[in-house]
Amino acid sequence: MMSSIVSWWFFWVISAVCILKVEFNIVEGGAYEETKVHIVYLGEKEHNDPELVTSSHLRMLESLLGSKKDASESIVHSYRNGFSGFAAHLTDSQAEQISEHPDVVQVTPNTFYELQTTRTFDYLGLSHSTPKGLLHEAKMGEDIIIGVLDSGVWPESQSFNDKGLGPIPKRWKGMCVDGEDFDSKKHCNKKLIGARYYMDSLFRRNKTDSGIPDTEYMSARESLPHGTHVASTAGGSFVSNVSDNGFGVGTIRGGAPRARIAVYKVCWQRVDRTCASADIIKAMDDAIADGVDLITISIGRPNPVLTEVDVYNQISYGAFHAVAKGIPVLSAGGNFGPGAYTVQNIAPWIITVAATTLDRWYPTPLTLGNNVTLMARTPYKGNEIQGDLMFVYSPDEMTSAAKGKVVLTFTTGSEESQAGYVTKLFQVEAKSVIIAAKRNDVIKVSEGLPIIMVDYEHGSTIWKYLSITRMPTIKISSAIALNGRLVATKVADFSGRGPNSISPYVLKPDVAAPGVAIVAASTPESMGTEEGFAIQSGTSMSTPVVAGLVALLRAVHPDWSPAALKSALITTASTTDPYGEPIFSEGMTRKLADPFDFGGGLVNPNKAADPGLVYDISAEDYRLFLCASHYDEKQITKISKTHTPYRCPSPKPSMLDLNLPSITIPFLKEDVTLTRTVTNVGPVDSVYKLIVEPPLGVKISVTPNTLLFNSNVKILSYKVTVSTTHKSNSIYYFGSLTWTDGSHKVTIPLSVRTQMLMYFDQ
């Protein structure tokens, strides 16, 4: 997922570039047919012996290709730990042929994904200086193992120092793999306990054949700053007196600073950051076998989003098997917001994370000649600039008249197109460029190079002053730090939004966490900074924040299922910021945030540790959901590897009955009744009363309206009947359903849309 790179000149270009290693096979008639990597998915493994599983894969390939030699040369990965399958070089006709094998669930082409931070955890109530709370109850995540699938790691970073850590947990079965500029004995320690890299589905293990730049490392070491930032945000150690070029000065740490980190490099520097699905699945398979306690993946595909078990959505496949084995999987909600239907990683068994701002900002003061001071969004770090002010329409108009002046211009283009202003700036020797563009929460630090971004409102204010002033002037000062209540919390404009167009009954995203201007470890070479720490933004940054919290929750509640952990996060999340102020949603226009912006709300880790009740979900519940979603019974059988052919009940269950900690009804016409089940994880003898805030024009009836728990009754169900008073198609309206015993508030969001005319978009 997207990250904002701190240097003004470095713009990410996000695109789906499918770079395939190409070979050719001779087919009938002497023609050549291209081979490329395909993933053959076989579902749950039949053997606990990994070698037997791999042998079965080779036998299947041998029967297809005709020889052991061809099978051995064709296979790329054998998935043999968490589930069964393999990746191999096949022609399209060979892929079609093997797909007809009775043991094969699906054959899919190798597809490609994209990559999507000091005050963060204090803002969420996890100050290490406070002796009480989840952070200390969980012993800072001691011995929890966080698996990070990303672009690698910069192992020398102080965020991965192992000072004060005990021996590596005995349950750890993973490894550190040597490679270019990566010595496992030197670079791994009691903090960074695992480091693997995966490239076989993309290219051979040498740079000559790979087409990657010399700056990339053929090892777990990363060349561009993403994976290091993600890993240190989730579980980085304490590091004092750090900053990004003077911003965010303080002590930095991850969410679970005493957790162990295992890195799986699956993304590579090509034309863009390329992450191949065959490698991602292999990394997830290894992570399951290695013994990680959770997996965080800040990776996703460009729109359109894909179904839970779509042939191109292999992350969901791998996540299903991890969750079935008790390993929670977190993934980024994507950076294609703020439009509707842009959220990614929408499978109900994944924890999908949105991004918010913090109560911290580094605005740059712009003082006009009339003594009006505006605060620009770009954090400028450099000497004060004073000069005459002029306006131009485009870079082409930035003539020699701009020499020595501060130039104002407006743009509707992308960040990439703004690079043209940088080039012209130096050609004509202007002092600075102020670019007015649509509001954007991606921060780029302008360090010594005066490229200042403002929104249209501030741009118009500057233009009005300029247009009525004979000799307009401006002063640009170095950025200042703003912290606390005065800085509003917002869902970032880039954060992927619901509703979920593929599975509309599943609310996504699930929760939100800070993902804007996050300071964490980075790669000093590419960041142009000796400190090795950087500000980045994106759902890639918010996801490891929540991963750190899940690590703490796992330490306190090792017996909770992934669904219970997810429920605790959602039902205790807040729709206000830590100061009690409303959370806004940033976009073309600003509004109050709703469940399609942030799911249950902003995570509240201390409350999540004691949620009172949880909505649990079993593997069988997910199978019933797949039945309700009209998946083929053979697919469900293979995915879960049941001993007998899986049969969906008749009639098929309702998708509304999946025991999610939310209720989303996208097509309400007649009354519907659904069921939810809660498990008491609080005081044994508890009485919970109901509070309902119905969506506008919607009636909610709940039976019973009181839940009584005791030593014999720990699990209770309730029914919810939903009806509409609307007479025509409506938009989505939102509400909430809360159970409270006086000390706990267990809240789930409600999202309801009336559809009197189906398939008619008003």
From Swiss-Prot:
Taxonomic source organism: Arabidopsis thaliana
UniProt keyword annotation of Protease present: yes
Active-site positions on this chain: D150 (charge relay system), H226 (charge relay system), S540 (charge relay system)
Residue span(s) of domain Peptidase S8: 120-609
GO cellular component terms, semicolon-separated: extracellular region
Residues bearing attached sugar chains per UniProt: N206, N241, N371
GO BP field: proteolysis
InterPro entries hit by this protein: Peptidase_S8/S53_dom, Peptidase_S8/S53_dom_sf, Peptidase_S8_His-AS, Peptidase_S8_Ser-AS, Peptidase_S8_subtilisin-rel, Peptidases_S8_3, S8pro/Inhibitor_I9, S8pro/Inhibitor_I9_sf
Keywords assigned by UniProt, alphabetized: Autocatalytic cleavage, Glycoprotein, Hydrolase, Protease, Secreted, Serine protease, Signal, Zymogen
SUPFAM superfamilies: Subtilisin-like (SSF52743)
Subcellular location: Secreted
Family annotation (Pfam families): fn3_6 (PF17766), Inhibitor_I9 (PF05922), Peptidase_S8 (PF00082)
Enzyme class, broadest EC rank: hydrolase
Highest taxon in the source lineage: Eukaryota
Protein's recorded name: Subtilisin-like protease SBT3.11
Lineage of the species this protein comes from: Eukaryota, Viridiplantae, Streptophyta, Embryophyta, Tracheophyta
Protein family per UniProt: Belongs to the peptidase S8 family.
E.C. number(s) listed in UniProt: 3.4.21.-
